[in-house]
């Protein structure tokens, strides 16, 4: 709180694709620098899907997916830890420090911020038997003390989605699940999803079908009618889950755009989709 005013809290999620190229990481870091210069408290959650797959190949590991989710055995968990907390976390940290962003890179397991539990076998569409995803976590508990302390000291947390269970077993947590858990546990004003596509399109091949604004109540109808398909369905389902957990709005922006995050927070012109929680 500054001068009696509530500090704006912003949660930014970036996928591994966003972090592959140095120029893209530097663009993201410049954007974050502008946002924190405006007084916001920022937390970044990052994935590392492409990096895990590539590192797995180098280590002779085959990536296995069921219903779009990675199956994580013990060797693949080691690759995930190296890719997330090592490669992507370190690369993002370096870009942020270059942009004068006081970032701290750490797994979500640190200080018990997020405690996981091994996901039980799940019934998923298209699979004859329940799927055992291996060393993959569901969220059991969020203890926000670490984030609150980092924010109070002026730092920007960069969180990878590695957690431990109550017995200290390292687990791979989906980055989407980490975002929704943090939104539920903390007072988050805005969530920004930085992706390869700047928002929601009815047809990715047709720029005129871009949807600049939506209410969360519109999402189910768009999916049921087939108006959005493919990866857009999963993205909108993620947005709906985030808004249900308490965020006021979610903006989807493209990582190729300069200062896309700052522009979304300031309602400046730009190519993006903003989804708001419907009034009660």
Language-model segments: residues:
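C-terminal catalytic "cap/lid" subdomain
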Residues: 2-280
């Amino acid at each position: 709180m500054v001068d009696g005013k509530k500090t704006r809290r912003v949660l930014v999620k970036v996928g591994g694709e966003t972090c592959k190229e140095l120029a893209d990481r530097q663009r993201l870091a410049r954007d974050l620098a502008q946002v924190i210069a405006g007084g916001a408290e920022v937390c970044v959650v990052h994935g590392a899907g492409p990096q895990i797959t590539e590192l797995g190949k180098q280590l002779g590991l085959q990536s296995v997916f069921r219903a779009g989710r990675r199956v994580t055995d013990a060797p693949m968990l080691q690759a995930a830890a190296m890719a997330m907390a090592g490669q992507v976390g370190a690369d993002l940290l370096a870009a942020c420090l270059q942009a004068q962003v006081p970032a701290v890179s750490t797994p979500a397991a640190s200080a018990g911020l997020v405690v996981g539990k091994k996901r039980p076998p799940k019934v998923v569409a298209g699979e004859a038997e329940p799927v055992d995803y291996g060393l993959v976590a569901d969220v059991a508990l969020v203890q926000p003390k670490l984030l609150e302390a980092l924010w109070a000291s002026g730092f920007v947390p960069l969180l990878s989605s590695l957690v431990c269970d109550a017995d200290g077993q390292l687990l791979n947590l989906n980055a989407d699940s980490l975002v929704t858990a943090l939104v539920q546990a903390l007072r988050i004003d805005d969530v920004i999803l930085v992706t390869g596509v700047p928002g929601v399109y009815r047809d990715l091949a047709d720029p005129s079908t871009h949807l600049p604004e939506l209410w969360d109540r519109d999402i189910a109808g768009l999916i049921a009618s087939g108006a959005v398909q493919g990866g857009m369905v999963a993205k909108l389902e993620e947005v709906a889950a985030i808004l249900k957990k308490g965020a006021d709005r979610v903006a989807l922006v493209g990582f190729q755009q300069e200062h896309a995050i700052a522009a979304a927070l300031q309602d400046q012109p730009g190519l993006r989709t903003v989804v708001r929680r419907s009034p009660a």
